[in-house]
């Protein structure tokens, strides 16, 4: 590198979060096959840096998970986009999310669905996520502290269900709360080294069909004690 180019690089202002976010979508999401325009738009608009601990914000737009405390993580951006696309977004649809965590996935879903119902078992994480939802004025997200294995029966049925933590098997309560014609997407597997994204579709008659897709690695889905 010649001295003039080095000097210009040193003088250049640091890349801001907005530019980092657009680069993340271009280099790590769109380039890897995500095509849904609504999903790409949501990923471009949603400030991931607000959902990570302040000391990790410099890594907010890198394509990898980050710890958010209490043994939990915010998922890799590509996986967030992939699962959102696999769900099949729709502005007239209602979605149940199991595992609010940082709130980032719910924020993405809020731009893709009419209503988002999200359950978090750890009260402190739910409170942190709700604070960011309020900051971003995301008024179509409804948060509940509770056991994700039981779902949210009072608001059922749901057109879509998304799991952001991995149970050994898909809880029957979540299948029951899935509307006819609905779809569930989530990681499944007790062994973190042998988890797969699973898609369950329920037809109009209530029969379900299951298919296994990509290998993944998620934190375990923890039941209430």
Regions found by a protein language model. Give the residues of each.
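N-terminal auxiliary segments of SAM/dcSAM-dependent transferases
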Residues: 7-55
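Conserved nucleotide-cofactor-binding alpha/beta core module
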Residues: 88-209
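Structured segments of extracytoplasmic/periplasmic soluble domains
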Residues: 27-32, 42, 46-49, 86, ...
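Short, solvent-exposed aromatic-acidic interface loops
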Residues: 212-222
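Solvent-exposed, acidic/flexible segments
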Residues: 17-22, 32-36, 72-80, 98, ...
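Sec-dependent signal peptide recognition
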Residues: 1-7
């Amino acid at each position: 590198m010649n001295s003039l180019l080095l000097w210009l690089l040193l003088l250049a202002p640091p890349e801001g979060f907005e530019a980092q976010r657009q680069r993340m979508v271009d280099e790590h999401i769109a380039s890897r096959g995500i095509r849904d325009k609504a999903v790409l738009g949501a990923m471009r608009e949603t400030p991931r840096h607000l959902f990570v601990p302040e000391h990790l914000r410099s890594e907010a737009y890198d394509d990898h998970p980050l710890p958010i405390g209490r043994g939990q993580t915010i998922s890799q951006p590509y996986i967030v986009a992939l699962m959102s696309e696999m769900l099949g977004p729709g502005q007239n649809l209602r979605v149940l999310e199991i595992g609010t965590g940082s709130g980032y996935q719910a924020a993405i879903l809020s731009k893709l669905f009419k209503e988002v119902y999200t359950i978090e078992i750890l009260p402190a994480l739910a409170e942190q996520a709700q604070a960011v939802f309020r900051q971003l004025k995301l008024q179509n997200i409804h948060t509940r502290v509770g056991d994700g294995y039981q779902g949210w029966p009072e608001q059922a049925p749901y057109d879509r269900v998304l799991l952001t933590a991995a149970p050994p098997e898909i809880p029957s309560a979540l299948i029951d709360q899935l509307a006819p014609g609905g779809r569930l997407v989530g990681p499944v597997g007790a062994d973190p080294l042998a988890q797969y994204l699973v898609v369950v579709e329920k037809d109009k008659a209530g029969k379900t069909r299951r298919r296994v897709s990509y290998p993944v690695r998620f934190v375990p889905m923890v039941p209430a004690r």
